[in-house]
Amino acid sequence: MKKLILLAVFWQTLNISAYCETGNRTASGVWPTVGFTCAADHLPYGTRVTLPDGRTWVVQDRFGGGYRDRLDLFMPEPDCWKWGRRLLRCRVETP
């Protein structure tokens, strides 16, 4: 039997910040991976978010505040400071 896979693809302008190692697992229970893990309250786990530079991140964590337009990228602490906060239009693919 074949499975039907539904995929939603859309563009969204997101307020993007960065976070670094806390020594804890993500809200989904996995260990965060630099350059891969991101946090979002409004997107399901497993959602792929592609930034304008072509890098793709996967939602594996939550903010916990019910934000609808925010994304937090997991990266090393020095890179977090360089990243700051950016408003970017991103491609979003939900599972």
Model-derived regions, located:
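Positively charged n-region of N-terminal signal peptides that target proteins for export
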Residues: 1-3
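Solvent-exposed, well-ordered loop and adjacent helix/strand elements within mature globular domains
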Residues: 8-95
